[in-house]
């Protein structure tokens, strides 16, 4: 089962997203601020993070700053950024800083489901591709030196 970390200061939003994703058989954990999120990443290895841009006054970092921090911890985890106060510039900024995608509140549950599946699948394919490159790289000289290859 895939695991998703939800980071939002609004408990109702965390609950709603969790319920949507539980119906799709995802395991979810929720936190409400940046320090809890960083701590949770040490023990809960998510396949996806859903991150609100505005994390409220009790958060040391806002969502974009936390996104940057997450990218330094593990840039392979896809992050979907959500916000109720979105602009095109904010979406572009989030994606420039490593977000997989950007969703505005209020959101459609179908969109959360589709983007979550796509983000996780994309990350898995990237991992597999990385592994294949590692396997292929040491064998590359063998191909170039083989006397059985006719060009």
Task: Report each predicted region and the residues it spans.
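C-terminal output helix
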Residues: 87-89, 107-116
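AAA+ ATPase active-site-proximal loops
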Residues: 133-151
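Active-site residues of response regulator receiver
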Residues: 8, 52-54, 83
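Two-component/phosphorelay signaling modules centered on CheY-like receiver
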Residues: 11-29
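Active-site beta3 strand of CheY-like receiver
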Residues: 44-50, 55
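Short hydrophobic/Thr-rich beta-strand motif most characteristic of the beta2 strand and flanking loop
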Residues: 25-34, 40
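Short amphipathic alpha-helix used as the core "switch/output" element in two-component signaling
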Residues: 39, 54, 59-75, 93
């Amino acid at each position: 089962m895939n695991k998703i970390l939800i980071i939002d200061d609004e408990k109702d939003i965390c609950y709603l997203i969790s319920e949507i994703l539980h119906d799709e058989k995802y395991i979810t954990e929720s936190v409400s601020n940046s320090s809890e999120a960083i701590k949770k990443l040490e023990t809960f290895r998510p396949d996806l993070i859903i991150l609100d841009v505005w994390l409220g006054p009790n958060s040391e970092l806002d969502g974009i700053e936390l996104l940057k921090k997450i990218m330094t911890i593990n840039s392979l985890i896809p992050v979907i950024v959500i916000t109720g106060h979105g602009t095109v510039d904010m979406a572009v900024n989030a994606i420039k800083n490593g977000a997989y995608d950007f969703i505005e509140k209020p959101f459609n549950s179908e969109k959360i489901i589709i983007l979550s599946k796509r983000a996780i699948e994309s990350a898995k394919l990237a991992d597999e591709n990385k592994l294949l490159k590692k396997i292929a790289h040491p064998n590359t000289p063998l191909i170039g030196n083989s006397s059985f290859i006719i060009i």
